[in-house]
């Protein structure tokens, strides 16, 4: 009877066996999935997370590539724009020269203007290089020098000489140097100016000696034309004789 009473009890729940193959009771509250279903869902969620991570990585890579491409395009556009402006400016100058409307400049001013335009072009190229490769562009030549010692100024002078003597064949070169030397020597003391003047005077004497030697060498190369001197002397003698004969004739006429 006791067993029957336990079966008839309202709150009776069958015992759940922990052994394999035993029938288990109803799933606990909140669990509506079969055994192993949660694991499959977790694996699926992991796959989705990996795909999303890969997609995000690709997007970031594209974002890093796109700015580089756009910067390169911008740089090319700037280069083309500067080339167009330079070409347009050159065409305007040529047109003004043809029409005669270009401003009249002295030879020194014309050479200075050419140097100024060349310097602007070099500065423009340097700025483009900085934009292309960053501020870590290595500057060489005169622009990179900041002389402070005697050796530095010697090297600086060599580079400056190479830069200026590129235009020594120009007709405006001597006048340009005259103005340049005067301008750069304005702030010097009198003693320093005397030293520079003496150096230029010595250079002038040396050039004069060279010119004299060259002129003598040219005369020696010409030589004497065969018979030329003899013919000249005979001509002079005949002229003298003719002059005497002409005087004798006049005296005879006067006597008659």
Curated annotation (Swiss-Prot):
Residues 1-14, 35-54 have a biased composition (Acidic residues). GO terms for biological process: formation of cytoplasmic translation initiation complex. Keywords: Coiled coil, Cytoplasm, Initiation factor, Protein biosynthesis. Its main location: cytoplasm. Pfam families: eIF3_subunit (PF08597). It is found in: Cytoplasm. Transmembrane segments: none annotated. Residues 55-101 have a biased composition (Basic and acidic residues). Belongs to the eIF-3 subunit J family. Component of the eukaryotic translation initiation factor 3 (eIF-3) complex, which is composed of 13 subunits: eif3a, eif3b, eif3c, eif3d, eif3e, eif3f, eif3g, eif3h, eif3i, eif3j, eif3k, eif3l and eif3m. Component of the eukaryotic translation initiation factor 3 (eIF-3) complex, which is involved in protein synthesis of a specialized repertoire of mRNAs and, together with other initiation factors, stimulates binding of mRNA and methionyl-tRNAi to the 40S ribosome. The eIF-3 complex specifically targets and initiates translation of a subset of mRNAs involved in cell proliferation. This is Eukaryotic translation initiation factor 3 subunit J. The gene is eif3j.
């Amino acid at each position: 009877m006791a067993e029957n009473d336990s079966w008839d009890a309202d709150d009776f729940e069958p015992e759940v066996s922990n052994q394999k193959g035993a029938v288990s009771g109803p799933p606990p509250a909140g669990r509506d999935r079969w055994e192993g279903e949660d694991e499959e869902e977790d694996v699926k969620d992991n796959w989705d997370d990996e795909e999303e991570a890969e997609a995000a990585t690709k997007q970031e890579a594209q974002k890093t590539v796109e700015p580089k491409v756009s910067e390169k395009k911008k740089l090319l556009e700037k280069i083309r724009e500067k080339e167009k402006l330079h070409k347009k400016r050159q065409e305007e100058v040529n047109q003004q020269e043809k029409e005669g409307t270009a401003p009249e400049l002295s030879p020194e001013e014309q050479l200075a203007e050419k140097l100024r335009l060349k310097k602007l072009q070099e500065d423009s190229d340097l700025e483009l290089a900085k934009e292309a490769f960053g501020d870590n562009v290595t500057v060489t030549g005169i622009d990179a020098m900041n002389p402070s010692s005697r050796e530095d100024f010697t090297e600086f002078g060599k580079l400056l000489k190479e830069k200026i003597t590129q235009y020594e064949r120009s007709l405006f070169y001597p006048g340009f140097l005259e103005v340049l030397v005067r301008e750069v020597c304005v702030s010097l003391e009198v003693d320093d100016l005397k030293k520079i003047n003496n150096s230029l005077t010595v250079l002038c004497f040396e050039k004069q000696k060279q010119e004299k030697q060259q002129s003598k060498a040219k005369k020696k190369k010409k030589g004497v034309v065969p018979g030329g001197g003899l013919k000249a002397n005979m001509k002079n003698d005949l002229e003298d004789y003719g002059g005497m004969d002409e005087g004798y004739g006049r005296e005879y006429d006067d006597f008659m």
